[in-house]
Amino acid sequence: EAFVEKISYVLADEVPVELKKLKKVIQKLDLVTVRYDVKVVRKGFLSFSGMAFEGEELGKPTDFLWVPFLAEQDDLAVPTYGIRINDGSRKTYVTALAGEDDSMEMIALAPATYAVFKLRGPATAAVWESFHYAKKHFEMIDQPTVEVYPPGNRQAEDYEMEVWIPIKEEV
């Protein structure tokens, strides 16, 4: 199914104090257009290498986590990944590359069924809109979510990315 929605960006008041610059950007995104297509896909084992961050702020925009990670990468021409893990007692976000790299933390994801959102629009708004849609239309399960960020300007109106949200597999 393909969808186009005008959404009001409501996270501006929830942004932590240390993200004042990002908050100003978000407030400018008062009304954005997010275009997305959704399909259900079964993925096998996945492995990533990256930097992990833990904390309560991980339910909010994570742009501040990407800065140190991307600073250590040389002008990447490959996708980067954001992996959100919430095991109940702690929240972890991993900025990552596909595959293995001994200089970074390794993370492996078990096979799962995902609602894969192909998104077009500013990444910050697009990611949150995909979660909003998934909560209404799928039974989400307690597995890590994956954000796929191709190279490019993540806040451009024509930026394209994917979000993989784990869902209960229909039998």
Locations of the language-model features?
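A solvent-exposed interaction/effector surface
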Residues: 1-171
